[in-house]
Amino acid sequence: MQVSVETTQGLGRRVTITVDKDVIENAVKSELVSVAKKVRIDGFRKGKVPMTVVAQRYGASVRQDVLGDLMQRNFVDAIIKEKINPAGSPQYVPGEYKIGEDFTFSAEFEVYPEVELQGLDAIEVEKPVVEVTEADVDTMLETLRKQQATWKETDAAATAEDRATIDFSGSVDGEEFEGGKASDFVLAMGQGRMIPGFEEGVVGHKAGETFTIDVNFPEDYHAENLKGKAAKFDIVLKKVEERELPELTEEFIKRFGVEAGSLDGLRAEVRKNMQRELKGAVRNRVKTQAIDGLVKANDIDVPAALVDGEIDVLKRQAAQRFGGDEKQALELPRELFEEQAKRRVVVGLLLGEVIRTHELKADETRVNALIEEMASAYEDPSEVIEFYSKNNELMNNMRNVALEEQAVEAVLEKAKVTEKATNFQELMNQTATA
């Protein structure tokens, strides 16, 4: 086997391989012998067909299969010999072949980039320092009450906390536009579902009133014909409802798994859950900054094959989230996922190099701690832990999570980490919008 390697462009490589004619002929003969033992041809007993007849009938297809197999096997041997690390499958380009002669083919593919980590000591990370206060617990209890609230119709003017049922009809420059009209639309105030100024225009009005509000569509509005345009909405306010919050009774408290039904017990449970959320939010905030800094400090080329594979993964994940099938997923425009896919590949390559250079392996103690932390959010943590322990795929996924955390910690050891005091709500808001 003769091998030559050349760089085509960037990470692209072309390996040209020549296979000796004797290797081909021996492989063809061996395969024909195997075929002769199995085929049935009229006039001959099974296994007794002369080789000349077998070769005449099956020689061409056997030779084609042998050449395909030899291309794959010789490619693998070549990249091992040349110490090449391909990213993705190669594209084979067979040369002209004549029986009794050597066979030359080429394989085109991309390689993984050579990553040499740099700039780790210039990465800046702000670590949030937060405590769950009694006021934070009070706010969370109020949120729980709102989630369990009922709605009661009122004659009072609508407030920013109410729910309104309206008919509306919008126009721009006196012309109605698509999607600008609805009847019996239930508007929950404070959720930001409408364009800026719409909810504010409803506040202060009572059921039975008809009025017009003036608003402006944002410059980044999704409909091109409405971006930045001034609009009028004619509104009929049909019903206003106000929240009725439940009292913190024993019955209410027991809904959240606090069997004793005591307020102190509920506060303790809420605090525990908030502290778990806080721990995860701080960890993710620090991790995001560390990875952002790592990516910024290391500009690397990425193999298109890896990006394509990641795009397919993201498409399938999107289909699962929105109830589509795999065929529909693959038809989604790749442009929707390309940037995210490329970043995921870059992050994977960089963290992989951190893991390699630091000789990291998943810490089983950390793996178990992560499983226990995740399981603590369920009603029966021991059942979840046991389920994980018996599922190799889930355990390996958790080992990958642990290994990624260890890699991030290795980056943080060299980064400039400062602490910044903040509060629970501010951190949660940052996490939600990240």
Swiss-Prot record:
E.C. designation(s): 5.2.1.8
GO biological-process terms attached to the record: 'de novo' cotranslational protein folding; cell division; chaperone-mediated protein folding; protein transport; protein unfolding
The keyword Chaperone appears for this protein: yes
Pfam families xrefs: FKBP_C, Trigger_C, Trigger_N
Top-level EC class: isomerase
GO CC field: cytoplasm
Domain observations: Consists of 3 domains; the N-terminus binds the ribosome, the middle domain has PPIase activity, while the C-terminus has intrinsic chaperone activity on its own.
Record function comment: Involved in protein export. Acts as a chaperone by maintaining the newly synthesized protein in an open conformation. Functions as a peptidyl-prolyl cis-trans isomerase.
Protein name: Trigger factor
UniProt source species: Erwinia tasmaniensis (strain DSM 17950 / CFBP 7177 / CIP 109463 / NCPPB 4357 / Et1/99)
